[in-house]
Amino acid sequence: MTLLDAPKYDAAASQRRMLAMYGFLGGFVLLFIAAWLAVGHPFDAPWTWWTYWSGEHAAEKLLRTVEKNDLPAAYAIWENDEHWQEHKDSFPYSYDRFAAAFGPASQENDYGTISSHQLVVARTLVGGDLVVGAMINGRKSKPLFLAYDHKTHRLTFSPVELTIDQ
C-alpha cells in the first residue's frame, strides 16, 4: 500500500459516527432546554441563568422564613450572613428596621402578617442585579419587589418596580 492509496470506504463506521454526532447534539439541545425550563425560562443570556435561579431561591427562602415568623433567620437570609448577630452594627439595614418591615405586628408593614406568597416576575437589570416580584397574601394590587445582588447574594428592597404580565 502506498501513500496515495485511499482506504476502503466503510459505510457502517461512517453511519455510526454520524449517529453519535447527532445523538450528542440532540442531548446537548435537550439539556439546554431542560436548564432553561428549570430556571424559569428567562429571555436572557444563558450565563445569567444562575443569577435567576439563585435570586429566586433566596427570595423564596426569605419569604418562607418570614411566613414562619422566624425573623432572625430571615434577616440572616436577607444579609446572606448566618452569623449576623456577632456583628450587628456592620449592616446598613439594621435588624430593627427589618423586623419593622416584615414583622406581623408592625405599623410599617404594608402587607400585614405574611401568610402566603407567590413569585410572579424576575428580571435582570443592567448592573447584573436581579429584581424579583412577589405577590403577598394573594394580593392583586402591588407586589413586593426585592433586588438580589449576584455578587454579595444579599437581598434588598428594589427601587425598580416591574410590570407584571398576567
Positions of predicted regions on the chain:
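Short, flexible coil/linker elements and helix-boundary hinge sites characteristic
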Residues: V39-H41, F102-G103, G138, H153
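Hydrophobic, Leu/Ile/Phe/Ala-enriched alpha-helical segments that form helix-helix packing faces
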Residues: V66, F102-S106, L155
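Short beta-strand edge/turn micro-motifs at domain boundaries
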Residues: K8-G23, M135-Q166
